[in-house]
């Protein structure tokens, strides 16, 4: 029987957000996310708690996604899910649920690479947002990843630069923890940075060859900076918080932009798309807009709802793979370390 419309259910469970979305022929009908606030008390994601919460959330989240979309499970053409990379326990919940649902409905199962989904989120149809033409450079920046990817086609991607230690999102969160900010600290640093002087304090940028990144040295430098200044003035952080946040953000954005400029120079590709949780940062968005005007780049910034982990990005990859008849078997397994 021919389907008039192609409905894809996307499931995302790579870290601490349980998400489900329904897409129809490239257009998102629903995008539901259940956040796990319990991790705030620990200053970071606790893997065991995350997987337990996914088990509690996944059925109601999928139910809500179908309900909001006005679609019954029998109308689904396929189930797409995040196979990796991510936290193994979290991935297992989403993978097991997706496999069971696809088997029960006797419909195709589609595995999705989480990092690929952050890039292809730009192809979700949303009013007011343009889609990049191939080839383009994608910079995926999040709490767990920092990469520059040369994208020649939907499924022809090559990582040309990545972090050799910590991810950029971790640099934001660990710096925020040193300043006494809550988790995740990135949004709070971004908010305070707008009120401070970005050149109040100087932090040395790490020197890394090629297009690779490093943030562990910067985190250590910030730690020593805080220790040194609070030793002489216990109120140093309180008195200078906005300036410290602005200076940290200015340094991190400088590192990202320096590598992007180098990537554009080497590849001769000046179409730039960003993705991942840190792409919500107002500073990096502003820096890209400046580069667009000053350097002639064409930049693509995702809608805020598609920056953090979400199932809409999984669904769009599922749809593109469905069109290619690119399905996976019930024998597939979750993989914590999955290469792009």
Segments from the language model and where they lie:
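Short beta-strand scaffold segments in enzyme catalytic cores
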Residues: 18-23, 138-140, 146-150
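Short Gly/Thr/Asp-enriched flexible loops that form oxyanion-binding sites at enzyme active sites
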Residues: 81-106, 124-125, 282-290
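A contiguous, well-structured pocket-lining segment that forms one wall/lid of small-molecule binding clefts
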Residues: 191-272, 281-295, 322-325
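Conserved phosphate-binding catalytic cores of ATP/NTP-utilizing and phosphoryl-transfer enzymes
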Residues: 1-4, 112-136, 317
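Conserved phosphate-binding/catalytic loops in two-lobed NTP-binding clefts
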Residues: 111-112, 272, 289-314
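Glycine-rich phosphate-binding/hydrolytic loop that grips phosphoryl groups
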Residues: 118-119, 302-340
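N-terminal beta-alpha supersecondary unit
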Residues: 5-85, 114
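Glycine-rich phosphate-binding loop plus the immediately following alpha-helix
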Residues: 152-195, 219-220, 224-230
